């Protein structure tokens, strides 16, 4: 059950510490998924590792690198000359933020990478990421833009003007 009242704000230092922990957690996920994939696919089944297994590894490394680099640059803290924390960076744990989508991409890639030890066809599940991106683009940008009224806005009637017109009509009768 959620606590009642206003959600407490977090200070710069707390955001800085949480960002460090979040980055450390996702780095462990990246390293773990790569270790499992390399151990199973490229060491145990080395003789059956194809060109596509190596390409999948390179693809996942590129996705991990881009996502992790983006997250770490968002969380970059600023310090003053005397070493005091000036800015804790963007909050990586903020809901509906860009970092949340980057974390989803890292998790999806890790899950697909580990499951692809069984079959390379599992990589087709990675198409969920661009599908989700297209969905968000449609819901937040394109859909409202296409469905917006393109005609001139209807003139708003002022209440005073409307009352005046009603009085004039009553006088005419």
UniProtKB/Swiss-Prot annotation:
It is a multi-pass membrane protein. InterPro entries: SND2/TMEM208 (IPR008506). Keywords: Acetylation, Autophagy, Endoplasmic reticulum, Membrane, Transmembrane, Transmembrane helix. It comes from the Eukaryota. It comes from Bos taurus (Bovine). GO terms for cellular component: endoplasmic reticulum membrane; intracellular membrane-bounded organelle; vacuole. May function as a negative regulator of endoplasmic reticulum-stress induced autophagy. Pfam families: TMEM208_SND2. Belongs to the TMEM208 family. One of its GO terms (biological process) is vacuolar protein processing. It is found in: Endoplasmic reticulum membrane. The chain crosses the membrane at residues 25-45, 51-68, 105-129. This is Transmembrane protein 208. The modification N-acetylmethionine is found at residue 1. Residues 160-173 have a biased composition (Basic residues). Disulfide bonds: none annotated. Residues 153-173 are annotated as: Disordered.
């Amino acid at each position: 059950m959620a606590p009642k009242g206003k959600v407490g704000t977090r200070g710069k230092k707390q955001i800085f510490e949480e960002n460090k922990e979040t980055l450390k957690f996702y780095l462990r996920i990246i390293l773990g998924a790569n270790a499992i994939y390399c151990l199973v696919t490229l060491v145990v089944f080395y003789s059956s590792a194809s060109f596509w297994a190596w390409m999948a590894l390179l693809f996942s490394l590129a996705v991990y690198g881009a996502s992790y680099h983006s997250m770490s640059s968002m969380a970059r803290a600023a310090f003053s000359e005397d070493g005091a924390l000036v800015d804790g960076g963007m909050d990586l744990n903020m809901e509906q933020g860009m970092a949340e989508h980057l974390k989803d991409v890292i998790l999806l890639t890790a899950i697909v990478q580990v499951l692809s030890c069984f079959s390379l066809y599992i990589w087709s599940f990675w198409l969920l990421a661009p599908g989700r991106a297209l969905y968000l683009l449609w819901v937040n940008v394109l859909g409202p833009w296409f469905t917006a009224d393109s005609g001139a806005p209807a003139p708003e009637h002022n209440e005073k003007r409307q009352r005046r017109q009603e009085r004039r009509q009553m006088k005419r009768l």
